Amino acid sequence: PAEVELVTGAPRGELVNNFVASICDGKLSDALTALGAVAESGNDMKVFLKLSIQKMRFALLLKVAPELEKMIAEEISKEDIQILKTIGAEKGSKLTSQTLVELLGAYEDIGKAYAPELPIELALVKILSQNDAQAKG
């Protein structure tokens, strides 16, 4: 796995899982910290976001359609499935289809920004600020 990460520019799975968990937990600071670690490590930001979106998609599918677990198990490890089930099942999870929509928009904008992490940072602020406003309202 370390060789694959080095050759492809893919981030460690732990970074992706921490990032996804931070978003789902509504922890903007933690999500931005994870994103900063990816930027500092020189990993490809587009690959990182693609992996993150994939995991969030699977977590959302496991939440709304648990019968798809077998299909998802063909794509990711058993350990990841357990992590994603936990993330999606937590009360107050910020895992929504709108979160995925925002991240997909950021994915498209990565190549257009002067700093590849900028579109992701903006999406995080939008996603988690909306969630904060809804929680307070």
What are these regions (language model features)?
Residues 1-136:
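Extended, largely alpha-helical regulatory/partner-binding modules appended to the mid-to-C-terminal parts
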